[in-house]
């Protein structure tokens, strides 16, 4: 069940429950011969819409939030998504994005998780901007160990210099 509600002309709330991504095309099979995880592109419509809002710095340069982790266990098994919500748009001159998703314990012993992302971004004159992001994953339910969480805090900015130049940077901390 999916619901979309326009709170204002520039702010939208999307809610999903008992999410089924069966209509999404299957990923190409890849063989991994090193210790680094394979990164598949996101194909689920709920996560693709307004995805650029949840990036820090230049898109593709650094990915503090990778939505493909939602609904997939550590060994690649499917973890059912109980539901979630996304608030995105403009609010008082700020671009805002809030995403909240909850998974359930599946057929395997993967604990349920709560995923949350909050992003604010302010566009300024002369191609300048600044913003902040918070990403959280918290293990929930009886299978979750105490202290089972990952948190990331980040800030980014871009300052237009003259007609063609720009200075861009970002800072992030994880725990």
Predicted regions and their residues:
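Residues that define the transmembrane beta-barrel architecture of outer-membrane proteins
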Residues: 1, 5, 79-83, 90, ...
């Amino acid at each position: 069940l999916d619901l979309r509600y326009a709170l204002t002309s520039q702010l939208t709330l999307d809610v999903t429950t008992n999410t089924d991504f069966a209509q999404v095309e299957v990923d190409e099979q890849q063989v991994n011969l090193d210790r680094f995880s394979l990164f598949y592109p996101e194909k689920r419509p709920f996560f693709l819409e307004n995805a650029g809002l949840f990036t820090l710095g230049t898109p593709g340069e650094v990915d503090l939030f990778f939505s493909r982790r939602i609904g997939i266990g550590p060994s690649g098994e499917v973890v059912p998504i109980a539901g979630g919500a996304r608030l995105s748009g403009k609010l008082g001159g700020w671009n805002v994005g809030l995403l909240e998703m909850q998974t359930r314990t599946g057929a395997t012993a993967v604990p349920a998780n709560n995923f949350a992302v909050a992003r604010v971004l302010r566009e300024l004159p002369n191609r300048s901007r600044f913003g902040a992001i918070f990403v959280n994953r918290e293990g929930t339910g009886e299978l979750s160990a105490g202290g089972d969480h990952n948190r990331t805090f980040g800030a980014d900015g871009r300052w237009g210099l003259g007609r063609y130049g720009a200075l861009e940077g970002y800072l992030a901390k994880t725990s």
